[in-house]
Amino acid sequence: QGWTITAEICCAVDTLLASANPDVALRDRTGAPYVDESGGWVDLWNRDVRTYIEELCTDLMAMGVDEIILSRVEHPFAEVMYTREIASSLNREAFCMNFSIAVREEIDKTMKDKNVHLSARVPHDVLTTGTDNGQSMDNFLKVYDRLVIETETYSDDAPLFTEKKIDSTLRFVPQMTWTFGGGSWILD
């Protein structure tokens, strides 16, 4: 009692999926599958990728998890080519939000029926300087129940939520290497 069973799914960086199904891989300027130090990237615009993530979420809910954390819901820093034609006016934030909204809408009924939360893991930069990878705290809080953020400065970070009138004890899950009293946290 008092424990939450969570599962984490890495979304945009999936070397195995990109290798097994090259049709879903992002492409570099030469047309080769895009790979960086993180691994092989898949195209979150691609319906097959979204369906794959949605099916993983559905399977995890059937197994009884209380919360699903989607990590690496982001766009690479490099310029890439997508697996399908998209409007040129769409930016990196649209890349992340389109995926996030589509996944949420597809699994929302099952999540409500099973009382499961959908969260996103984001880098600490989302709280402070912002990111160039398409992740936005304001946008993600419209889709995800909570944000999991790696931090060593919880006492400094929590006010960033309260300034925006967001309950940091409910919407901000710090991931730390040490424990503290109260709230939700993930310990590495």
Regions found by a protein language model. Give the residues of each.
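Acidic (Asp/Glu)-rich catalytic clusters
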Residues: 1-2, 136-144, 161-169
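Aromatic-lined carbohydrate-recognition surfaces of secreted/lumenal glycan-active proteins
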Residues: 4-14, 69-72, 93-134, 148-152, ...
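Active-site-adjacent "subsite" loops/lids of carbohydrate-active enzymes
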Residues: 12-58
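Active-site-proximal loop/short-helix segments
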Residues: 15, 20-23, 66-97
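Short, electropositive alpha-helical surface patch
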Residues: 19, 25-28, 123-144
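An active-site-proximal structural segment forming one wall of the substrate-binding cleft
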Residues: 41-73, 136-139
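Alpha-helix N-cap and loop-to-helix initiation/capping positions
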Residues: 44-48, 52, 87-99, 132-135
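Short, well-ordered alpha-helix to beta-strand connector turns
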Residues: 65, 144-145
